[in-house]
Regions:
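Conformational switch/transducer regions in large eukaryotic molecular machines and scaffolds
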Residues: 24-207
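Low-complexity, polybasic segments enriched for Lys interleaved with small residues
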Residues: 7-8, 12, 16, 21-22, ...
Length: 207
């Protein structure tokens, strides 16, 4: 008699899929966190604290700003529109956004160099304009606004890169500069200025 065949198992050789948790929820959570982080990065920073200051105290504006944060220049919220006139009487280099051509690249460059050389304030009176328009400073030199706002422009005579061949010879020599007395001020009549700039400055409001 022929030998009996041993019956083979009919179980499929295909592996059984695990019914455990999948990675999809974790991936969705990670994507959600990335989206939230991107949204937070895109959102404007909050308005920084605003200190009230009198017109009389504006003569000490730079000192007041330095006492709060020595790495920041002052932003003045001027609802009455008198602060620019105050600075003109103090021999500052005042440029007005309201005047056509006043913020042209070469005029800005010369006003900045003059303020650095003679140790005077450079004042950008933005009036009712969006103060983010101060970014036109970058038309003078790439990333100039960053180095101006964080004061690194004053380090290692970096400001000399702004000097052109046609400028007077005194501008080519750092010995003729009084940068220790230089200051930078932005004025706005907007009670709620753009925080992309305001957050990088020390904010005051004239009472």
């Amino acid at each position: 008699m022929p030998p009996k065949k041993v019956p083979t198992s009919k179980t499929s050789s295909t592996p059984v899929k695990s019914k455990g948790t999948t990675t999809k929820p974790a991936a969705k959570k990670a994507d959600s966190q990335k989206a939230e982080a991107a949204a937070a990065a895109a959102a404007p920073p909050p308005m920084p604290p605003v200190t009230t200051i009198s017109m009389k105290a504006l003569g000490r504006l730079t000192e007041e700003a330095n006492s709060k944060d020595p790495k920041k220049w002052p932003l003045v919220i001027d609802l009455q529109g008198n602060v620019a006139t105050f600075f003109r009487y103090r021999d500052a280099n005042v440029l007005q956004a309201e005047l056509p051509g006043d913020l042209d690249a070469d005029k800005l460059r010369r006003a900045l160099l003059g303020a650095l050389r003679f140790g005077k304030p450079l004042v950008l009176d933005m009036g009712s304009h969006d103060i983010r328009e101060v970014e036109m400073v970058n038309d003078v030199e790439k990333n100039l606004l960053d180095s101006l706002l964080d004061k690194t422009l004053l380090d290692d005579e970096r400001y000399l890169t702004l000097v052109k061949d046609q400028d007077e010879k005194e501008y080519h020599n750092s010995a003729y500069y009084a940068t220790d007395r230089f200051s930078f001020v932005v004025i706005t009549t907007n009670p709620s200025p753009n925080t992309l700039i305001a957050a990088r400055m020390t904010c005051f409001q004239v009472e």
